[in-house]
């Protein structure tokens, strides 16, 4: 079970450390203090994950069982790579038999078994390059993509929802039948057209906010399970609704 860490880490460093004022702005100091005292950050370091985001995926999987049996996975917005680390492990991906393809416009250090493309997913060539890198239809498409925040909540929501929509259409284009799609979104409502499209193509569509997401964060995840296949009839039963779970 993925339990929230408490107290101190196994290295003996206690939570609640302060950063000396020095020349740092108050906002920067608060961010650093929050980061170094975050139990998920400390746990990620101890368990060898590149970011605390690993526990978001593990927690979602613990409840919704999306990773077991996956043979190929595509990871969008992959840097720094914690989701790709998990994907490589569950698919038994190796450099000689890569089963994970990842993409980000940011640099990412190599991960064994992960074919990484440093490019913008919105580049017209990106989808085809990902399909070539994975060597077959993926069982899962993951997207942790988010547009750089502006501080204006509605603007940030619209920009990130655009990335979510592009990722969703890509997932429908490439997923193996029975596959799953998981994408970051922001609180503020998922676009009706996107939800309708996902419900038409997947057996179940839900919103998820894992405990490892910071309490003050507006991020949520949109999970679509059980891809019906590209030949699914429009007369199929609609998917279960996108309630928060």
UniProtKB/Swiss-Prot annotation:
GO terms for cellular component: cytoplasm. The keyword Transferase applies. It catalyses: uridine(2552) in 23S rRNA + S-adenosyl-L-methionine = 2'-O-methyluridine(2552) in 23S rRNA + S-adenosyl-L-homocysteine + H(+). Residues 1-26 are annotated as: Disordered. Keywords: Cytoplasm, Methyltransferase, rRNA processing, S-adenosyl-L-methionine, Transferase. The keyword Transmembrane helix does not apply. Its main location: cytoplasm. S-adenosyl-L-methionine binds at residues 81, 83, 104, 120, 144. Its EC number is 2.1.1.166. It is an enzyme of class 2 (transferase). One of its GO terms (molecular function) is rRNA (uridine-2'-O-)-methyltransferase activity. PANTHER family: RIBOSOMAL RNA METHYLTRANSFERASE, RRNA METHYLTRANSFERASE 2, MITOCHONDRIAL. Specifically methylates the uridine in position 2552 of 23S rRNA at the 2'-O position of the ribose in the fully assembled 50S ribosomal subunit. Belongs to the class I-like SAM-binding methyltransferase superfamily. RNA methyltransferase RlmE family. This is Ribosomal RNA large subunit methyltransferase E. It comes from Sinorhizobium medicae (strain WSM419) (Ensifer medicae). The gene is rlmE.
